[in-house]
Amino acid sequence: PYSMFQTLTKGNGLMGPQTWMTPQERYDVIHYLREKFMKPMHPKYQSLTDEYLAGLPKVNTVVPITKQVGRDFGPALASQLGRDVSSVLTVKLGDAHSISYNLHTMDQAAVWRGGFLKLRGTQHYRERGESVPEVEGDPISGLQSWRWAHDGGFDYPTEDLLPRGPMPSKWMEYRGHHLHGAKVVLSYSINGRDVLEMPSKPAGFRAIVHTLHIAPGKQSLQLSVAQLEGEGARRGFLDPKATTVKLLQAKKSVAERLAVIGFPAKGPLERFAAAATFGETDGLDWSFDGKGRAILTIPASKKARLFQVIRYSAKTDAQLLSMAGYLGHLKLKNALPHPAKLLLGGKVRWPKVITTKGTLGKADAAYVMDTLTLPAKKPGKVWFRTSALAFFPDGRLAVCTHGGDVWIVSDVDESLANLKWKRFAAGMYEPFGLQVIDGLVYVTCKDRLTRLHDFNEDGEADFYESFSADDDVSTFFHAFNFDLQRDAAGNLYYAKSGQYTSYALAGSVIKVSPDGKKREIHCTGFRTPNGMGILPDGRVTVSDNQGSWMPASKVSLCKPGGFYGYVQTHVHKQRLWAPDGGRIDHRKVVPPETFDQPLIWMPQDFDNSSGGQLWVDDKRWGPLSGRLLHTSFGKGWLYYMMLQEIDGHDQAAIVRLKIDALTGIHRARVNPQDGQVYATGLNGWNGGGRKGLSQGHVHRFRYTGKHANLLTDTKILADGIELKFNFKLDPKSATDASRYKLKQWNYKWTQGYGSKQYSLRNPGKIGQDEVDIQGIEIVGDGHAVFLKIPDIQPVHQVKIELNLHAVDGSPFKELVYLTINKVPGP
């Protein structure tokens, strides 16, 4: 067991360390293996009895009790809630009260007292956070219904609604939330009428208060504010001046009265839910329905209306009368906060600007790596798991974290000596992509594209705008939205996970119009597309990772309507994820006969978990400018690619820069001020990756101006391969066939996890083929060679190892991988 524990903790061979597991979970794995596999085969298996346990050595070390670090997400956190509601905003109300809104309906998902959210097993605390946010505390009985009516009722048909997406805009449109200090103002429309809503919990009284500003509209609105079901309930209205509990029955209610649902039908109350209104209440009407709902009707109006709904749930007559007393207090105070006055920002929440000093790499090569040091002491105990980055035109850097932050870094100069980090936003839903457009930060979240506004220009976001809501949001932890790319026309692109999701169409690339109003599926068939890129002509690239229906890691150059390999034929045994939430029978999914081939395949030891791509077009980045770069989340490496198009078929070769990042990198951008490449990423679920990667770093890959001998191009020709270099070759070594080692192989596309390497010459046989070179020619002025391979043909993978010399005698060793999709005709 001890050696197994060491393997799980530190890794061994091809198995990476399972750092995401707690010690208890590692012991659970060991116990499972012991009982399930070893027990039947081990004749001397020792049963776990009290006597056996008593005979074990005594532990004389005190195990420290670890306390959960308190994260500060600001006043609200976007997430899912449990495994049923995939997009919520949970608001801290104060006094350990919290409310969660379903952003697909703007109905309440839950309201409770006793804490915020249970997050210990999620990505906010664990590398591989497979748990989901749950209510931390006790749901408030009777107040779980805060629900808008549509089509004349609350039990409207849902068959034609998106199962994991927002309602039709004619019913509800969520616009975002504003922050003003600790206050949160929600902006949305219901049945065509604009609503501003600010939830709160009054000091000294355990009620939930909703301040509502309802815009004019021709349609009346209905809102269920409380609900208690059961036989023998009493329903009626309480005069706020009453000194005893006597519920009045009226054909038409008076808005100033309290609407009450209580038990039992007679005698002192044992439990109740009550609601009241305050403010501009003329024309508001209370009613009850057969399902125990207290319903507020807001009439059509030519004027806007500002009022509060106060909701309270307790057990006794005295507590109900205390609510009447609270209403009297409100009337004496005669003050009603106006949400519209809280939309442009309040006081700074995180005033501290943190200064760090970066580390410069030794400028002894053409390309070196610098490190932008992350803040050590951070406000809110932020876990700096960096997930994406983007630049402002002036060179300021936006960096987001997996936990939901955006930070702005200024003074990103050549020396990196005085980096200033300022927290700009927090509480977003698993950001994995960033863009800066016209000075505004756009964030790819799990449930939408969010656009951040700083109205009062204090360096913090005041409005988290829902720029484009995703129409299919899965509740499984692995269902990420990746990256954010922008074409010349202003369209935005991001990629959705394929496997381990409940999506109706898994593994899609989503194209969003410049105004955020139009969404379309650009292409499909990706398993875990953790990264994208975009070429100068507007075509997008997408990476993928080895797994089911994915033979190896790859990068694809995508076309509209393309299909790139992943087929949704898998389902979780407990149905935590299933095609279209289980609406599609995965057993009846018929895989296509083929798929669109990638630019490049890559074996696991070269890139086990691919990141995004970056087209570098700044000449200040030296000889590798003007080409496509690739990143590796699993290895923490940066690569450059050489593209070739033959008769409409695209293919590539790829070479790794010999620099080891300190973390897995999957997002890269060019700084417009210095022309250098910056990259970021994190670590987590990374079996087979490079060991020792950190949970987050930001690096600069800098061109120093020094010369580097480089392989600059590869071309597949009718009878061989041409290799070009940026230096003149030594003819003797360049024409020596022993200086080149070429191997080739294919992968098999199946529903199994990954693929072995298969012979091209003997299909079905596991193994690589040696590639014979029939001749070598120096091409042109000595900067290129042609390797004559008469039987060259399409193949998934070619591996070329070079061991050459330049004409000045300097050695040149390189490893390059190619994919051949097309060989030109003679």
What is the predicted role of each segment?
Residues 1-40, 477:
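Extracytoplasmic electron-transfer domains, predominantly the class I c-type cytochrome c fold
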Residues 41-86, 313-370, 375, 824-826:
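N-terminal pre-domain segments of enzymes
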Residues 42-209, 220-253:
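Beta-strand-rich N-terminal accessory domains
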Residues 179-209, 704-731, 738:
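Surface beta-strand/loop "capping" patches
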Residues 220-222, 226-307, 749, 762-763, ...:
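Trp/Gly-enriched beta-strand surface patches
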Residues 320-708, 712, 731:
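Beta-propeller domains with acidic blade repeats across secreted/periplasmic ectodomains
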Residues 337-339, 705-711, 730, 793, ...:
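Acidic, Ser/Thr/Gly/Pro-rich low-complexity segments and short DxT(G/T)-type signature motifs
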Residues 723, 728-775, 800-806, 814-819:
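Short, surface-exposed alpha-helix to beta-strand junction/turn motifs within ectodomains of secreted
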